[in-house]
Amino acid sequence: MAFADYPVQSLMYITNRPEIVFTEGKGSWLTDHNGKRYLDFVQGWAVNCLGHSNDGMIEALNAQAKKLINPSPAFYNEPMAKLAGLLSAHSCFDKVFFANSGAEANEGAIKLARKWGKKHKSGAGKNRFEIITFDHSFHGRTLATMSASGKAGWDTIFAPQVPGFPKAILNDIASVEALITDETVGVMLEPVQGEGGVLPATQEFMQQLRALTRKHKLLLIVDEVQAGCGRCGTLFAYQLSNIEPDIMTLGKGIGGGVPLSALLCTDEVASFEAGDQGGTYNGNPLMTAVGCSVIEQLLAPGFLAGVQERGAYLRAQLLELSEAFGLAGERGEGLLRALLLGKDIGGQLVEAAREMNPTGLLLNAPRPNILRFMPALNVTTDEIDTMIGMLRTLLKAHG
């Protein structure tokens, strides 16, 4: 089919899309309607943690579809319970609520923190509802999660905002402490700010934050929608800092490409009462069966060590490129990395990469002066080398 034969005009406009219709994908590769192949270093913004059409996920999806798709979240089902058990067994959390998107999980985290703050009032007897978040953070596109986000301009798009989200500066503990009041209930952050430009919170800052929140009896909430599920080389990114948060959210990678997210908390924080939280598809057995396959593959012997090795390899290759072209360096954790371009050519490089022939390359520029890399966690060093070679060609032409 030609592009003109696809009724794309029926889709609501939300962003500028190129005239490409993807029809197949396997591993690190996508194929479009013309048969052109693309090396994918975006993977749906870190969603496809095991690459496109992973065999284990396909098997889990097919097997579950033949047994049970949707009995209603008012009842238990087998994959729901199994995945909750896997997550609690391999984290510091005791309770799990499943949802469909990272924004929904983060919305749930905000509700849970506010519920806990009502039950645990301040010394002055006030309900605690404010959650300190951070400049340049990204927590979703619902009204509350947009208000929680520190993305420039989002405070006016759908004004008035949901109140209660003062903004601190990442890796500046004094900026957090200065915002604490009798109405503060918690602090919420991404261990690595993805949309903000792949900005990692330092281990020292995470430890300071945990100490500060404990001192003031506040909740520490980690948004691991992008950084979690093996992306940073550990199962969860908070584990890099040897701390234990009170609440964590997961999305993207937990489903490996299917709509699945999770809100996790400790027993002490689990405050919801009947009717406080729910959702038509939460804990859906079709999605949680795939989630079980994803987590089991991430926990397979040597897998996370391999992520660390390939992350170090990608880092070294990006640093070499940076030095060769006089760029501003690189940063990140594991296989969530950024190349600092030093000038606003990110969008130009993304477009040129996609249009390369005979094979295209999919990259992402969260900021005009940054390229972000989110390959499948099982990407090979050969595929990294191929990407670096293509990027080298682009930098020669556009750098």
Curated annotation (Swiss-Prot):
InterPro entries: AcOrn/SuccOrn_fam (IPR004636), Aminotrans_3 (IPR005814), Aminotrans_3_PPA_site (IPR049704), Class-III_PLP-dep_AT (IPR050103), PyrdxlP-dep_Trfase (IPR015424), PyrdxlP-dep_Trfase_major (IPR015421), PyrdxlP-dep_Trfase_small (IPR015422). The modification N6-(pyridoxal phosphate)lysine is found at residue 252. Coiled coil: none annotated. N(2)-acetyl-L-ornithine binds at residue 141. It holds the Pfam family Aminotran_3. GO terms for biological process: L-arginine biosynthetic process. Its cofactor is pyridoxal 5'-phosphate. It is found in: Cytoplasm. Belongs to the class-III pyridoxal-phosphate-dependent aminotransferase family. ArgD subfamily. HAMAP family: ArgD_aminotrans_3. This is Acetylornithine aminotransferase. It comes from Ralstonia nicotianae (strain ATCC BAA-1114 / GMI1000) (Ralstonia solanacearum).
